A protein has these predicted regions:
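Sec-dependent signal peptide recognition
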Residues: 1-8
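Short helix/strand-capping connector loops at secondary-structure junctions
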Residues: 164-173
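Amphipathic C-terminal alpha-helical segment
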Residues: 148, 163-164
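Internal, hydrophobic beta-strand segments that form the core of beta-sheet-rich folds
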Residues: 155-158
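Gram-negative (and chloroplast) outer-membrane scaffold detector with strong preference
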Residues: 54-153, 186, 190-193
Length: 193
């Protein structure tokens, strides 16, 4: 009887372990999906949705290295010749999660991306494609831990990039190097292992 009471006292005084895999101090994997609405700034701004799937290697509760496949479209409000941009890219980033209390994990990330961008005018036969690179992508967000394996939350991401995408009114031999920046606001869902 005394040994049972002693064991019960020891177990009740032991600190509980992490309630979420995102808080565990070990290497883990996260699979995620995200959807956002944003602006792409090229010659003019183009607005539209983008989607992504990601795999993240988690080193403890704070540091993560992520890899993502992303696609998005944007329509221009240009009155003379409206156009659509379609972007496909591979991205990677380093992410740091902050421990602010039970169930809430703000985070910041910094990364790069590489891909292609396609331009199509709604009323012209002109089409163009080019490679694109985001030299810097800064992300800010909050993960709300739901249960042991799930995190969901909003994010904001801005990027500074470059492309040589030609527009319909560019001269044939012109240097078409231009900035290609973007700002996205969306939500992501992660499953942790």
């Amino acid at each position: 009887m005394g040994a049972g009471l002693l064991l019960l006292a020891l177990l009740s005084s032991a600190e509980p372990g992490p309630t979420s895999v995102f808080d565990e101090d070990r290497v883990g994997i996260e699979l995620g999906a995200r959807a956002s609405l944003g602006q792409t700034f090229w010659v003019l701004a183009a607005a539209g949705p983008s989607f992504g799937a990601e795999v993240r290697l988690r080193f403890g509760p704070h540091l993560g290295l992520g890899f993502a496949l992303e696609t998005g479209t944007g329509k221009s409000p240009d009155i003379d010749h409206p156009w659509t941009l379609r972007r496909k890219q591979i991205a990677f980033d380093l992410q740091w999660r902050f421990d602010t209390g039970p169930g809430i994990r703000p985070w910041v990330s910094l990364g790069m991306s590489f891909g292609t961008i396609d331009l199509e005018y709604d009323d012209l036969a002109f089409r163009a494609s080019a490679h694109t690179v985001d030299f810097a992508r800064l992300g800010l967000g909050v993960d709300f831990l739901v249960g042991r394996f799930l995190a969901i939350g909003p994010f904001v991401r801005g990027s500074l990039g470059h492309t040589h995408l030609a527009a319909a009114d560019d001269p044939p031999e012109a240097d078409t190097g231009r900035s290609l920046d973007s700002l996205d606001v969306g939500v992501r869902v992660l499953i942790g292992f």
